[in-house]
Amino acid sequence: MGFRNVVIKDSVFLVNGQPVKVKGVNRHESHPETGHYVTPEQMEEEVRMMKRANINHVRCSHYPADPYFYYLCDKYGIYVQDEANIESHGYYYGKESLSHPIEWMPAHVDRIMAMVERNKNHPCVIMWSLGNEAGPGQNFRSAEKMVKARDMSRPTHYERNNDIVDLGSNQYPSVDWTRSMAGNK
């Protein structure tokens, strides 16, 4: 059993009041020998390799992981950024994005809230990611409000739609953008 409190204060990520430098990886459920089926033993070896490599964070790319993976992350102390299975970047970020039409709102909200309900009791989950590269529309605004109404204990994340979440990211930064963010350090 574990407990955690996650706060972002003055751009510092705090877990249980302690600053944490997140050192993470993206993880897809796949294995070179078994394909998209990963055995419990293979999952455990993955998590143990992460610990040996001083990795403390996993982003579930681009869908929630097998339930056993969360058990292992709870057991070994790996932080998880849980990501909803919403990826529609074939429509990318324009007005064609499925994140805009109101008729797609129930699908967005349902997928995100299903992830939250399924994994809300895992202390390893330190952040809810609304999805991946699926546009900046109103459907994500609605879903983020639903997440916060259900769980205020974790920050929310989404790629590029940074104005609606607690922690945004730019997964394809230009060299100039990266330099400007680094402040020539």
Question: What do the predicted segments below correspond to?
Answer:
Residues M1-M50:
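N-terminal carbohydrate-binding accessory modules
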Residues V47-A53, H57-K185:
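Substrate-binding/catalytic cleft of secreted carbohydrate-active enzymes
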